[in-house]
Amino acid sequence: MNYLKTIGSFALLLAVAGCNPNGPDPGKGKIDPKYEGLVLNEIAAHEETQEFDTWVEVCNASDQPRELDGLGLYITDQFFKGQKIADLSGTLAPGERKVFSTADETLVTGFSSADPFTLVLGTDKDIVADSFECKADDPSLGYFASYQRLPDASGEWRLVTYSSQGKVNELFDLSKTRPTAVWAWGSHMSDLLANDGAKLKELKAKGYDHLLLNYSAFDYPTNKPLAKRLIPMCDELGIAVHAWLQAFYDGDWVSPIDDAKKAFKEEIFERIRTDAARYIEQWGVKGIHLDYIRFGGTAYKHNYTQEVNSINAVNRACREVRETCDAFEEGIVTSAALMPEANSSEYYGQVPSQMAKYIHILMPMIYRYGSYNMSDNTFKSNSNYFAERAAAGGGVSWSGIQTYDANTKGLSAEKLRRDIDLMAETNASGIVLFRYQLGTFPDVNDLWN
């Protein structure tokens, strides 16, 4: 068979029938009132890889039911010109949305955000309901990013680093979550994912809404496949994943101050900013958590000028991470781990009230067992100290709680709940448990509702 001749003959038949063989033209297409209000609402253009699907969400933004029969999705890119890649059918109620995906083959091929493309919702008779154009200079999508209309179904298009497939398009809002978090290592992901995420689902059911996931989950090659499974599962459950990065530590303490030059080490601050941006862009995390955002007990040895000193080094890193997160305009949250001693800036360079000018959530590690051996009163007093300093700087404090005793034996749910209740009696706005896989986590659904 002469394939080219057959294609040419088919195109001629379409033209005679009043059909456009190149699909509807978004610049010239007509509008049919029966499709009014049907819009392309969200697009994840990940080509057609083994790990990530391409999908398109169509939404009915009108106040009337709309028939989809006769509509299709048409792609024009470096490979196709007006190629139909989906046949639509059925009815969408007002506000209802439907996803077409390569995962279930309702979308017959993927397309990539790395190259220009135009997607049209329309018919082969030049009826255009809506269209979207990805231009050559537009940034490509990260693993979990998508192009979205914001506000949902009516606003302008923008790239968002996390998607909302099948849900209302909206930016992350910390106030809509519970102030309950867990620190987890990259090595914990296998356990969290086992049995279809049974333990992850249990965490959510018990009232924990945030997961502070160590940088190794994103950076270690053996962990990346697990992170690619864990993050969408967390999104589906309503658990916000924060990337937990190490600021002034890389297997050993890394001073952000060059003592010989009495100047900041610019490469340290650049690395922190770059890592934060990379975790957001590539992984779609909802927060950046700074650990080791301090000196290892020797801050007083690095104070040289009014500008170059340990406190300013810590504050600068906090400020630059906040600026990096805010630049995305996606509600990305900043948090930081603090040492639990009051008035300890001489040793760590941490001044909570100053850090809270840039950090949304201070997370003091108020670990009562072991070397600190805190009484109930000291435990609560330390929590109040950080809560008050956080508030003075415009932030909040979630008290970090140890889930194991002095012998690294996990606490029972009853004992851990007692410590949590003590923190709930203070001015702390939430809790963070250290760490996953140690201790039995109690139900906390009754707290901070």
Regions found by a protein language model. Give the residues of each.
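Intrinsically disordered, low-complexity linkers and terminal tails enriched in Ser/Thr/Pro/Gly
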Residues: C19-K176
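Boundary/entry segment of secreted carbohydrate-active catalytic domains
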Residues: D173-K199, L203, A336-P340, Q402-Y404, ...
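Aromatic-lined carbohydrate-recognition surfaces of secreted/lumenal glycan-active proteins
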Residues: A181-W185, H242-Q246, I311-G349, G394-D405
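Active-site-adjacent "subsite" loops/lids of carbohydrate-active enzymes
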Residues: V182, S190-L192, L226-P232, A240-W283
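Catalytic domains of carbohydrate-active enzymes, especially glycoside hydrolases
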Residues: A194-D219, Q282-G287, I361-L362, T426-G430
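Active-site groove signature of glycoside hydrolases
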Residues: L212, R271-V308, V432
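Substrate-binding cleft/loops of secretory-pathway carbohydrate-active enzymes
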Residues: V333-M374, T408-L411
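Substrate-binding cleft of secreted/luminal carbohydrate-active enzymes
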Residues: P364-F379, F386, G393-N449
